[in-house]
Each structure stands twice: as C-alpha cells, then as structure tokens.
C-alpha cells in the first residue's frame, strides 16, 4: 500500500510540475468592431436608419411624410447627414417642450 501511495504522490507531483510549466491559454480574439458608417454627406436610407436606431420601413415612412429631408439622385434616395441631425434635434425639442 505504501508503494501505491508513493507512486500516486510522485504522479501528482509530476502533474503539478507540468501544470506549472504550461503556458496560459491565449485569450480569445476580440469581436470584430462594428462597421462604422461611411464619412459621406449623403447616406442611403438604410445607413440613416442604422444611425437613428430605426428600422428601414420606419425611416422610409419618415422620408415619405417629410419629417426627414431627402434628395433623389436619379432613381436613388439619399438622406443628407444634416437631415438626420435636424430630425433628432426636433425630436429632442418636442420632448423637452412637452
């Protein structure tokens, strides 16, 4: 029985030494950074919706109602970056006035 205990103690000691020598596991790669919006003057409706935190359908409805200014370039609909800021400022003013 003493030899079994001695062998077990020796095995545990060698395992402890191996664990002490082992390098820590590498940290996982960080999540890729969220894509930033392009630094353009005119944004697509989808880009404007993302910046406002709204859905595409709601943003199209705001454009159709005139609440968000937009321009047409051929068949394309674009929203000036300033129109997004103006819309947000109007919302804040309405909320603070109420």
UniProtKB/Swiss-Prot annotation:
MF terms per GO, please?
Answer: DNA binding
TM region positions: none
Q: Which residues bind DNA?
A: 42-63
| Alphabetically ordered keywords of this record | DNA-binding, Plasmid
Please name the InterPro entries in this protein's record: HTH_17, SinI_DNA-bd
Write down the Pfam families for this protein, in alphabetical order.
Answer: HTH_17
Q: Which domain of life is it from?
A: Bacteria
What does the UniProt record say this protein does?
A: Possibly a non-classical excisionase.
Q: Which family does it belong to?
A: To the xis proteins of bacteriophages and of plasmid pSAM2 from S.ambofaciens.
Q: What is this protein called?
A: Probable excisionase
Source organism of this protein record: Saccharopolyspora erythraea (Streptomyces erythraeus)
